[in-house]
């Protein structure tokens, strides 16, 4: 069993990695000393160390070596779960329990009683330890400070993971491709790219995701939730990075410049995607037809042509679309909204991509260059048409 301490940090039991939420188990976890006293188990021939803590006065704890769980009663009580003995029966539901405390908890459930109430959130708990955990969550106790940036954390393990952002350490390596990660959970999600496993499925449209965070973000499309709001204009977004990009529209900040054509971008990722226009690199390839794309989002949208998936439906006319951006653009045909304005001539557009193409008329930008003869065009379809002449 992992070291048990009274420092406020919750740790798990190393034998099986479980973290226990039951009253007795949590008390055992928070115990501080081994008294040296033991209970003898006649059934398994094991000795059980007696623990004690500073929680309820006089309460003693013991650990059952057979399954490595900790309990506030002698091991013989827990042994009933191993031999099937349930001596305490509740008449209302005819359910049997191995000890008096579980019987009491069941009675409380039927009677609707709650012994411990959390004032901050109004939640009520049957066990005092569950209440104690809730209190800790509300007090947001963060005793672990990063000496590099001053950020505080609730657990030392969180601080350890955070420190890797400063040191650059990435100890978790993918055996398939060699990519490294700062935390194990990121590696677990990444590995699913190779295995194709997507255990998190959207109940609305059936789309599946490799990670829980991906599903959480996706669900906002259906619920309309936009938790990230701009303090300047009140505009809200369902992704934090979209809010970050939006902030730059107020400052007109575009710090990332293309060395080939001089065009500036708000983020390094936008510059990276743009640069592929010049290099011709298209790393994202469709497994169905072989078509390649410069950005992953374009491939993702393209794949829906093969699957026929159109999860985004217009509530006004019922027309369905493969992407949320296509739906948003379509809705503007009903509302007449054209939020994208050309600063040169005042012409308005429904989509930002339409504005971008239009602006090239004023700037003379021709980013699509023929590798054969060097002739350049402001539209990709014009370059495609030209290539046929060669």
Swiss-Prot record:
Zinc finger (C2H2-type): 88-110, 116-138, 144-166, 172-194, 200-222, 228-250, 256-278, 284-306, 312-334, 340-362, 368-390
Superkingdom of source: Eukaryota
Cystines in this chain: none
Cellular localization per UniProt: Nucleus
Entry keywords, A to Z: DNA-binding, Metal-binding, Nucleus, Repeat, Transcription, Transcription regulation, Zinc, Zinc-finger
GO cellular component: nucleus
Protein's UniProt keywords contain Nucleus: yes
Single GO MF annotation: DNA-binding transcription factor activity, RNA polymerase II-specific
GO biological process: regulation of transcription by RNA polymerase II
Keyword Repeat belongs to the record: yes
Signal peptide (from-to): none
Pfam families on file: zf-C2H2 (PF00096), zf-H2C2_2 (PF13465)
Family listed: Belongs to the krueppel C2H2-type zinc-finger protein family.
Function comment: May be involved in transcriptional regulation.
The name this protein goes by in its record: Zinc finger protein 121
Species of the source: Homo sapiens
């Amino acid at each position: 069993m992992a070291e048990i301490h009274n420092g406020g940090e919750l740790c798990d039991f190393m034998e099986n990695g479980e973290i226990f939420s039951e009253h007795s188990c949590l008390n055992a976890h928070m115990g501080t000393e081994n008294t040296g006293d033991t209970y003898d188990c006649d059934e398994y021939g094991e000795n059980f160390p007696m623990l004690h803590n500073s929680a309820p006065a006089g309460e003693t704890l013991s650990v059952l070596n057979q399954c490595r769980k900790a309990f506030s009663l002698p091991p013989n009580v827990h042994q009933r779960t191993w031999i099937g003995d349930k001596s305490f029966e509740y008449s209302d539901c005819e359910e049997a329990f191995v000890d008096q405390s579980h019987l009491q908890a069941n009675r409380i459930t039927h009677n609707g009683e709650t012994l411990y109430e959390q004032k901050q959130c109004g939640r009520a708990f049957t066990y005092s330890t569950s209440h104690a955990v809730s209190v800790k969550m509300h007090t947001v106790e963060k005793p672990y400070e990063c000496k590099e940036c001053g950020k505080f954390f609730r657990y030392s393990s969180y601080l350890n993971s955070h420190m890797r952002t400063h040191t650059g350490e990435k100890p978790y390596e993918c055996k398939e491709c060699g990519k490294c990660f700062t935390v194990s959970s990121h590696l677990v999600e990444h590995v699913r790219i190779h295995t194709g496993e997507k255990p998190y499925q959207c109940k609305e449209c059936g789309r599946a995701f490799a990670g829980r965070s991906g599903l959480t973000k996706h669900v906002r499309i259906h619920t309309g939730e936009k938790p990230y709001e701009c303090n300047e204009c009140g505009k809200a977004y369902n992704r934090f990075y979209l809010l970050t990009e939006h902030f730059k529209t107020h400052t007109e900040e575009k710090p990332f410049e293309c060395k080939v054509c001089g065009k500036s971008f708000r983020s390094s990722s936008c510059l990276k995607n743009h640069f592929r226009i010049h290099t011709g690199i298209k790393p994202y390839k469709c497994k169905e037809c072989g078509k390649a794309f410069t950005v992953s989002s374009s491939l993702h949208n393209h794949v829906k042509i093969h699957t026929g998936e159109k999860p985004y439906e217009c509530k006004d006319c019922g027309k369905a679309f493969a992407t949320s951006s296509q739906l948003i653009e379509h809705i503007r045909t009903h509302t007449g909204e054209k939020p994208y304005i050309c600063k040169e001539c005042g012409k308005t557009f429904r989509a930002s991509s339409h504005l971008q193409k239009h602006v090239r008329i004023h700037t003379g930008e021709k980013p699509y260059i023929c590798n054969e003869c060097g002739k350049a065009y402001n539209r990709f379809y014009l370059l495609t048409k030209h290539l046929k002449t060669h």
